[in-house]
């Protein structure tokens, strides 16, 4: 793993230890509420004709720093929903991405779309936490989990009513993810070791993945031509965050990206 990924995972172990000590609880203003039933993240992507869009609410990242200074996750999510996207991704990592679990609750309550908890999952406690906070899906990163963990966490997430997006970056991780029985595979075009981006990563890995497993392309998607190529290659969905956050009106950006 890269230095930054090592640091993130080390911090997650600290967070899990604290979670184990303190228990899982909701913020006071949400304590009496219970999230609506799971909305079917995977099914939402599959039911859309053409390339589905997962729009991400992302305030910052380790590689790019602050992305959106005036960050309002509810306003962002409502705008995404009006634009016709199929799902929303919410960063919940606090220390490296300036995210917050509260954002997950707030977004889930504000929109009718399925919501992905985007974080670095290393323990089943985080799955319980994600479920309590209303996540319809969670991210499992093959670079930080072994095959057994990928399988066990996916199965446990399903017991809790959540889908799992298993993220890979290279062929070795893809083989591990497929062996774990994943049913929704994400290809991160950003190399977590050096944070370089290569959209061709998706097309290389597409050749390894059975057509019955939906594929999601993540990171570095900035041009309409990229989305057209993804659709032509049989990719199910594109996860787009920074491009939408940086380039003004999400509606205008998506209209440009979706143009024929």
From Swiss-Prot:
Keywords: Amino-acid biosynthesis, Aromatic amino acid biosynthesis, Decarboxylase, Lyase, Tryptophan biosynthesis. It catalyses: 1-(2-carboxyphenylamino)-1-deoxy-D-ribulose 5-phosphate + H(+) = (1S,2R)-1-C-(indol-3-yl)glycerol 3-phosphate + CO2 + H2O. Pfam families: IGPS. Pathway: Amino-acid biosynthesis; L-tryptophan biosynthesis; L-tryptophan from chorismate: step 4/5. Its EC number is 4.1.1.48. The keyword Cytoplasm does not apply. CDD domains: IGPS. GO terms for molecular function: indole-3-glycerol-phosphate synthase activity; phosphoribosylanthranilate isomerase activity. Gene3D superfamilies: Aldolase class I (3.20.20.70). InterPro entries: Aldolase_TIM (IPR013785), Indole-3-glycerol_P_synth (IPR045186), Indole-3-glycerol_P_synth_dom (IPR013798), RibuloseP-bd_barrel (IPR011060). It is an enzyme of class 4 (lyase). One of its GO terms (biological process) is L-tryptophan biosynthetic process. HAMAP family: IGPS_B (MF_00134_B). Belongs to the TrpC family. This is Indole-3-glycerol phosphate synthase. The gene is trpC.
